[in-house]
Amino acid sequence: MAEHQVNYTQNNGLPIVLSSVDKLLNWSRSNSLWGVTYGLACCAIEMMATGGSRFDLDRFGSIFRASPRQSDLMIISGTVTKKHAEFVRRLYDQMPEPKWVISMGSCANTGGMFNTYATVQGVDRIIPVDIYLPGCAPRPETLQYAIMVLQQKIRRQKALPHLKPKRLI
């Protein structure tokens, strides 16, 4: 009699069941991005326009929330001063895991034209940023595209990073 060997793992070594759960969790996380907005300057107007009926972020599953405790996405737009840095960090720390950040506009990305002692030269000096949107001010379509790119990034991530594949032999 021939013995059949059954391989219950996929290419990355995780069991098939965990890989399926991984895909399901990533799909659900990517299609329900609830963002807390932190608009500080002109880019906030474009961010508000993106949430309006003309651009309709709801069809991507993205809703703007007022509380960071209900959000998994933070969108920062405008010039961040050193006084604001503490509040940005506090809002980021209040968000539940997993969390993502979009930096919108030249001022949030690099400090923009405000190279002064009171300006933070890029929000990535305070919190980790996943996607940078260039421009002054970026169009609402750019923010929509950034959310779509973030959704693709989330789908590729490992939903359960703390699980390590076990060797059976």
Curated annotation (Swiss-Prot):
<keyword id="KW-1278">Translocase</keyword>
<keyword id="KW-0411">Iron-sulfur</keyword>
<keyword id="KW-0874">Quinone</keyword>
<keyword id="KW-0004">4Fe-4S</keyword>
<protein>
    <recommendedName>
        <fullName>NADH-quinone oxidoreductase subunit B</fullName>
        <ecNumber>7.1.1.-</ecNumber>
    </recommendedName>
</protein>
<dbReference type="GO" id="GO:0045271">
    <property type="term" value="C:respiratory chain complex I"/>
</dbReference>
<dbReference type="GO" id="GO:0008137">
    <property type="term" value="F:NADH dehydrogenase (ubiquinone) activity"/>
</dbReference>
<keyword id="KW-1003">Cell membrane</keyword>
<dbReference type="GO" id="GO:0050136">
    <property type="term" value="F:NADH:ubiquinone reductase (non-electrogenic) activity"/>
</dbReference>
<dbReference type="GO" id="GO:0009060">
    <property type="term" value="P:aerobic respiration"/>
</dbReference>
<feature type="binding site">
    <location>
        <position position="42"/>
    </location>
    <ligand>
        <name>[4Fe-4S] cluster</name>
    </ligand>
</feature>
<dbReference type="GO" id="GO:0015990">
    <property type="term" value="P:electron transport coupled proton transport"/>
</dbReference>
<dbReference type="GO" id="GO:0005886">
    <property type="term" value="C:plasma membrane"/>
</dbReference>
<dbReference type="GO" id="GO:0048038">
    <property type="term" value="F:quinone binding"/>
</dbReference>
<feature type="binding site">
    <location>
        <position position="43"/>
    </location>
    <ligand>
        <name>[4Fe-4S] cluster</name>
    </ligand>
</feature>
<comment type="function">
    <text>NDH-1 shuttles electrons from NADH, via FMN and iron-sulfur (Fe-S) centers, to quinones in the respiratory chain. The immediate electron acceptor for the enzyme in this species is believed to be ubiquinone. Couples the redox reaction to proton translocation (for every two electrons transferred, four hydrogen ions are translocated across the cytoplasmic membrane), and thus conserves the redox energy in a proton gradient.</text>
</comment>
<dbReference type="GO" id="GO:0005506">
    <property type="term" value="F:iron ion binding"/>
</dbReference>
<keyword id="KW-0472">Membrane</keyword>
<dbReference type="InterPro" id="IPR006138">
    <property type="entry name" value="NADH_UQ_OxRdtase_20Kd_su"/>
</dbReference>
<dbReference type="GO" id="GO:0051539">
    <property type="term" value="F:4 iron, 4 sulfur cluster binding"/>
</dbReference>
<keyword id="KW-0830">Ubiquinone</keyword>
<keyword id="KW-0408">Iron</keyword>
<feature type="binding site">
    <location>
        <position position="107"/>
    </location>
    <ligand>
        <name>[4Fe-4S] cluster</name>
    </ligand>
</feature>
<feature type="binding site">
    <location>
        <position position="136"/>
    </location>
    <ligand>
        <name>[4Fe-4S] cluster</name>
    </ligand>
</feature>
<keyword id="KW-0997">Cell inner membrane</keyword>
<keyword id="KW-0813">Transport</keyword>
<dbReference type="InterPro" id="IPR006137">
    <property type="entry name" value="NADH_UbQ_OxRdtase-like_20kDa"/>
</dbReference>
<comment type="similarity">
    <text>Belongs to the complex I 20 kDa subunit family.</text>
</comment>
<keyword id="KW-0520">NAD</keyword>
<comment type="subunit">
    <text>NDH-1 is composed of 14 different subunits. Subunits NuoB, C, D, E, F, and G constitute the peripheral sector of the complex.</text>
</comment>
<dbReference type="Pfam" id="PF01058">
    <property type="entry name" value="Oxidored_q6"/>
</dbReference>
<keyword id="KW-0479">Metal-binding</keyword>
